[in-house]
Amino acid sequence: MTDRIIVKDLVVFAYHGVHPEEQRLGQRFEVDLSCAMNLREAAKRDTEGATVSYSSLVEIVAEISSRRTFFLIEALADDIARTILSRYAQIDAVTVTVRKPSAPIPATLGYVAVEVTRDRND
């Protein structure tokens, strides 16, 4: 059984996309994280130092989203996943979902999204 830390529906405003107007005007992106790790020690000790801080995960997403412009949300999701794994040895794998609710597509849709999973073997 795998334990997970989950961050759902994090909203960031950023300037990602292949179209010049996306990079100029920016738009909302929604991000979910699911970090697989052993949480037994955190549950037993009941101290913040025994786990990964949720707010630090949120900060990573905000930092990467604002640090540079990505053409593809695939690249954004991959960068978030790899950064989380590089900063937290206790996380075994991470799944990152990036949703783009306002994709410039001539159709009525809720959102487009990508989901990537990275682990220590990637």
Give, region by region, the residue ranges found by the protein language model.
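N-terminal, polar/charged subdomain of small-to-medium soluble alpha/beta proteins
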Residues: M1-D122
